Amino acid sequence: MKKDLLNSELHMMKKTFCMFFLAAAVPAAFAYRTSDVSLGGEWFFHMGDVAGGEAVSADTSGWERVKVPHDWAIGKAFDMNYDKQYVQVVQDGEKKARERTGRTGALPTVGAGWYRKTLELPKSESGKRVYIQFDGAMSRAKVWLNGEYVGEWPYGYASFELDLTEYFKFGQPNKLAVRLENPPTASRWYSGAGIFRDVRLVAKPQTHVENWGTYVTTPKISGKSATCRIETSVADFSDSGKKVSVRTSIISPSGKTVAQKTSGVEISGGRGKAVQEIEIKSPELWTLDLPALYTARTEVLSDGEPVDEYFTKFGVRSISYDRDGGFKLNGKRVQFKGVCMHHDLGPIGAAFNVSAARRQLEILKDMGVNAIRTSHNPPAPALLDLCDEMGILAQVEAFDEWKMVKCENGYNKLFDKWAKKDLEAMMRRDRNHPCVVMWSIGNEVPEQTVPEGRKTAKFLADIVRAEDPTRPVTAGCDRNKHAVEHGFVDELDLVGFNYKPFYYKECYDKKPRAIIYGSETASTVSSRGVYHFPTKESKNPWSHDYQVTSYDLACAPWSQVPEDEWKGQDENPFVLGEFVWTGFDYLGEPFPYDGGDYVAKSAYFGAVDLCGFPKDRFYLYRARWRPETETLHVLPHWTWPDRVGQKTPVYCYTNYPKAELFVNGKSMGVREKGGAGKFGKSRLIWEDAVYEPGEIKVVAYSADGKKAAEKTVKTAGEPARLEIKADKKKFGGEELCFVEVSIVDKDGNLCPRADNIIYFSTDGNVKLRALCNGDPTDLTPFGSNYMRAFSGKLLAVLEADGDARGSVKAASGGKGDKAIKSASVKF
């Protein structure tokens, strides 16, 4: 991409008008506008195939009632035999194939499932065109209305629209049927299964804005004004011969209309496009700290009368990339402090929920994260809405696989027919989001290794540039030398390297146009609250408990500990930053316990566990990424009855330059950053600390030697009671409540090795949605009402129909647990 194309502009997010207009309730001039009705809520569902499941007369009396968004697998029992895969993962450096268990989460995602729902629109809507819009359906979706086949869309992560007009009957019940099927060996991680994102029924006037039909940029921005360029695509099925025009109003973040323009549309073959430039005076910029969002209100006029209305969220901001100057947002350099995120939401699975996703992003922001990579697929569009609102940058990724096989039944089966459609759909859906700053066309694709792979990269990159020339094209490259030698990276605007910090300088020298960053870094693994001795760095960790030490010294054979990546960045300031693998633990890929007789269902890679509880590594990144904010974290815990008198190293992760350790009041010396060895710059370490019951205290000092902060960790006594903490008191509907339960001693100290079984009960309209403890080896179903604590903690997810009115109680009822006092919270 030319440098001038890398100087991009404002982008924004389309949001269709989400209120259903009944003709009797609104003025006549508005009755013809688009009505957009969410189909979330109750559907009928049948697990397994059904002969004649599409028929109008299909019997659903034995079907399950579920709420969409829905993941049919997440609440079921785990089984390590589900979707076993026998595969050689070249990307991981494997020389031969081996059996993999738990790769897709050990849950029953494979197979077919049917959904049915009755749709109705009043006769007053007659004359409109009717569409159904899916934000995502996993996978191989086929849709029927009133027994008639409407269409299909196989890529489960793609959003799509199908036209129901021909078969829709106004004023009558319409029978919608959706068949989904997930083949085996189709994914490398937990995909989820079902209609796992939002669905909408949209009735549009004959003349209307097309789906994803606006494209807004800001080619010129100054302190005094911003030029807003809006392309609006209009469909006209009316054959009325009436004059069509578009009136665009710009609404400020405070809700005031600050500019307006009307332009004619030349209709040809039923379609037309308006291109408008509108000046915004004294614009409020979209920034990471103050993510101001404007709205473009688009009205389609027919002979001057409004017939359709469409809303687009966007932000006024500029982005640019430079080989040496880095990434700039509104003219100021920003280093990517990013994480990769799979799409599952832990114990609630792949069924998207805004409150759960918001919670994840809030936790990551506290760590210092300013960017996410949607690994390795288009996300739920509402996730990007959240990034827009919260000031988080996003790399949106399209594919994990092209033509060459990574999974036997993966995207390679779809590429030739669907890649262009899927990529265009992603681009048109997401190109108005100000948070999106780059497009990824692939991750670790084998095409890097063959000369002809460059052609496929060019094919996809050309589609991206045609749809949005304002943002760069990238990909995650793990076969670095092949990608450079075969010219694969020459088709990219930004060269993303996966786990290659020692190659940054070589590529920089070989490719004079290359702009480089770490698209996937670290892959350090750990289990929250688990510590193994002796402490040692390992690239192939294994332990009899199927856990990984949280001293943050273990990683995969293909990867590194965080300090290796940081060295590559610090020595090469041209590097744009990194996207760590991963922000959260996720379902599937339970390395290193991912084969044979191992029992593990979820990954160990996250800086945050599956519950949303930070691991120690969270604070290692926080200390680096938020140097102006106090971080003082001490590990391990100090409850080791079996280690009295033994060396038990103490680590401190802090933004302060030095700290002193005290064991039961005795100083173990001061450690300063900048010491020898790989970890000297980032960790303060007392290798010779000896365990004795009591307490450890770390006192941090500022650069001038003054005491700045202190942190004490005490030896815990016997479990005495449960502590319960809800993240909110008001919830219900789609808003979930996340309840943290901790086992503490009589003085309130966390019992870090407690694994008591905790039972939950609710009353009123409060219901238990899921339980999770963050232990990758625990196969208790998420939908149970009991679960063991892991490292002294447990998460309960609550839901309610309507505003929550009731309570939740947590009690330990296992053998010998009678002395542990229960806890509850009322809503």
Language-model segments: what does each one mean?
Residues 153-156, 168-170, 264-272, 676-680, ...:
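Short proline/glycine- and polar residue-rich coil/turn motifs
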Residues 58-59, 241-247, 260, 288-295, ...:
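Short flexible loop/turn segments that cap and initiate beta-strands
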Residues 164-166, 276-286, 684-691, 782-802:
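Short, hydrophobic beta-strand segments
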